[in-house]
């Protein structure tokens, strides 16, 4: 499947979910049958005696295809820590084949899929594999979300090297403004444009309560497509 995208970030809490939701909304506006996929999530809440991850709930909400929670998020860990740690603690193992079978189910229902990673590109899930191993196995096109703040240039360049050295396709990058005002936002982006080896897809302005406005706000990010 051509339009199947993997979102990774330079760090945690830098805008992977916001970027994912905006891209799902943009693909909806273009008329695609969209599915969001969060194969592994750490940190959950409980409602009506059911456990869920808030990022996965948002991906499900903004998918145009009707999906069960389990289809969006097959692996859910209670503690908001690295899955490798919770694997060891709870004697659980993340199976790469389960991640792949979940993706295959979504491919049968959708023609545009957005996969949101957990942590960073090399987040370990066991002694045998890290996130980038599965991305490569599935031949997914990678989009990097860069949270614009002090230190982001170094983080972005290091993550870019990790993407390329892992043999992944680096399709593009998104700048996410983490602060309402920052004198150096444009300076950061100008420097990133000179150092990134993939296209700049656009920026996301700092927008409080963005999820409540998503259907109405203008979106300036370019929709990643492959014909």
From Swiss-Prot:
Gene Ontology annotations for the cellular component aspect, listed alphabetically: cytosol
Required cofactor(s): Mg(2+)
Molecular function, one GO term: ATP binding
GO biological process per UniProt: biotin biosynthetic process
Pfam family, one: AAA_26
InterPro entries: DTB_synth_BioD, P-loop_NTPase
Record note on quaternary structure: Homodimer.
Annotated function: Catalyzes a mechanistically unusual reaction, the ATP-dependent insertion of CO2 between the N7 and N8 nitrogen atoms of 7,8-diaminopelargonic acid (DAPA, also called 7,8-diammoniononanoate) to form a ureido ring.
Name of this chain's protein: ATP-dependent dethiobiotin synthetase BioD
Lineage: Bacteria, Pseudomonadati, Pseudomonadota, Gammaproteobacteria, Enterobacterales
The encoding gene: bioD
């Amino acid at each position: 499947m051509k339009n199947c995208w993997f979102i990774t970030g330079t760090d945690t809490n830098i805008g992977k979910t916001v970027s994912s939701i905006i891209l799902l909304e943009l693909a909806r506006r273009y008329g695609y049958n969209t599915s969001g996929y969060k194969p592994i999530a750490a940190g959950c809440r409980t409602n009506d005696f059911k456990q869920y991850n808030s990022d996965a709930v948002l991906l499900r909400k903004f998918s145009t295809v009707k999906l069960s929670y389990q289809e969006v998020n097959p692996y859910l860990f209670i503690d908001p820590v690295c899955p490798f740690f919770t694997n060891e603690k709870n004697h659980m193992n993340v199976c790469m084949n389960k991640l792949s079978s979940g993706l295959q189910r979504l491919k049968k229902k959708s023609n545009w899929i957005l996969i949101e990673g957990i942590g960073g590109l090399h987040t370990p899930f066991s002694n045998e594999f890290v996130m980038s191993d599965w991305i490569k196995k599935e031949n997914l096109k990678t989009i990097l979300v860069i949270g614009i703040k002090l230190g982001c240039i170094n983080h972005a360049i290091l993550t870019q090297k990790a993407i390329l050295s892992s043999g992944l396709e680096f399709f593009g990058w998104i700048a996410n403004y983490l602060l309402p005002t920052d004198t150096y936002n444009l300076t950061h982006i100008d420097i990133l444009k000179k150092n990134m080896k993939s296209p700049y897809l656009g920026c996301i302005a700092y927008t409080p309560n963005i999820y409540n406005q998503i259907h109405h706000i203008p979106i300036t990010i370019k929709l990643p497509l492959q014909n």
